[in-house]
Amino acid sequence: LLAVGWTLGTRSEASSAVFFGYSTLRIALAGGLVLAAVLIFRLTRKSACLSAGLTGFFAVRERVYRALLLLSAALGVLLWSFLFSWLFVPANLRPALLWLIWTVGLAIALLRVGYRGVFRSESFRSHFRIFPRWEAIAPVQKKTMGILLILSLLYLAILIPSNLNGTADLEAFSRYGGDEFVIYPVLMDVMKPGETFGATLYHLFIYEDYHYGYPFYAVSTLLLTPVRLLTGAAFPDRVDLNLPILRMGVSVVPLVLAAWAIVYLFTHFRRPLVSALTLVFLLFAPGSLQNNQGFWHPDGLNLLFVCLSLVFIRRDDERFGRNFYAAAVCVGLSIATRLYGFFFAPAIAVYLIGAVLRKKATWPRAVRAGTIFILVMTLTVALSSPYLFRADARGRMIEILSEKSGEMAHGYEGDFDPRNDYRPGWAAWYPAFEDHYVRMFCFVFLWGSLLTGAFLGNERLTYRTVALWSLTITAYLVFFVAVKSTQYVLPALLPLMGGIFALPLTIEDAGIFSKRTRTAAWLASGAVFAAQLVLNLIRIRPRFF
């Protein structure tokens, strides 16, 4: 009733008023709220019957879990809608949205109180937990994670000096140049307060330069918010603080986390030495360092979303549960950031079909899971890209993407290209792979190892998913993209490179090969690893000395 009073508290504009000074929308909203109040009143008169019905319904504990999940999702969408009622959601909806937020929030609170025993149970926690409890992690996995943490911290420390380059002041930054100098003013505009709350939201979410998706600017904004609060009006000029934080927080740390995800995919952290060597192999690839030294860009974040998608698909193990839909969220974030998530389509399709063929799911269940996956992915893209809800912003985005797709297909107009690099095809792309990632002998060995794992052992799902992903995105780059930017290849080749020890791991896992064969596989992988690592270290030496 309070929402009804708020809705009718002010008259509509004269141009839209149709009845007693109110617009059709305002009258419809007030009528809907009155109807909701009447229905709620009628339900309260049948509270005993309703309570018994709900008790019977929630006797199946799975329904309690699902109800909490759906109510939480609804509350998130309602809060999002209320926030954006200052931008594109009709302001007249605010009273109704607040009432719904209150109602759904109250329902969640009552559900948590009424079924607190269920929510405190280990079965509930295990049902909703994405990552395992620390106590449930095996000692060897904890040991591996400790080693990886030490290596990662050393890596971050090594990269600090190179990420201070060009950050002394604005003049030094302008000389350093590059994409950062173009993107930085966009971020400063995103973080600039407006004269009104609505104007501030416009700056924050409708940033008008859609070369990169909003998750990139959102993470950058979160990282720099403490600096902005501390430095005040001098904030835009503090490149000595802002740039190192952005480079380390948006480029380096996400890539390191992505490398952890790749290592987990192939070792499950159960092989300390193999895990450590694989992490070093990934982090010291020339392409990784190109991204991690003086380069604030969205590609580290995008790589993290891609690798998390692969991890969640593997953890789901064709059950179509929470991990499968967590993968949908990560795929959506990759799409919202850099569009790469679209290239998961073949891998997801094969994953669904494979579950049916292996009798782990029926066709109707696979179709339902695939449909929900698409819905979750789409909702993630929409909610993480608020500008999509404004027609002018969508038009600007389409214009930019159209222009960018032409550049990707044909190269940057006016650029000096003496080697004729701006062309698609394997002959044009392979030198980029070789210079920044792996030589041909290692490339062939990696694919051979991955395909072996796709047909032998207990990790076939991992290898098939990684192979399909890598093949799809690599084929797109090779045959349709002319620009050879190093960071474009990160999501294609880094997961592939994570399989450097896949051959011996697969042969051991299969349990059908002799000790001599297992030893030969380890020696072969070790030789390829050592040779490629030495070549990469030689390649990256000028970056440090």
Predicted regions span which residues?
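Transmembrane alpha-helix segments characteristic
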Residues: L1-L2, V64-W80, I147-S152, A276-L283, ...
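Specific aromatic-rich, kink-prone transmembrane helix
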Residues: L39, L301-E318, A327-V331, P495-G499
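Signature aromatic-anchored transmembrane alpha helix within multi-pass, membrane-resident enzymes
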Residues: L69-L75, L149, V329, V350, ...
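Perimembrane helix-loop-helix junctions
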Residues: R129-I130, F312-R322, V331, F343-L379, ...
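Extracytosolic helix-loop segments that constitute the early lumenal/periplasmic catalytic or substrate-binding loops
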Residues: S162-D169, Y176-H211, P215, T225-A233, ...
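Hydrophobic, aromatic-rich transmembrane alpha-helices
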Residues: V256-L265, E434-Y463, I473, I500-L503
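Short acidic/glycine- and proline-prone juxtamembrane loop motifs at membrane-interface regions
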Residues: N291-L301, S485-T486
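Membrane-lumen/periplasm interface segments of specific transmembrane helices
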Residues: R368-E413, A531-R543
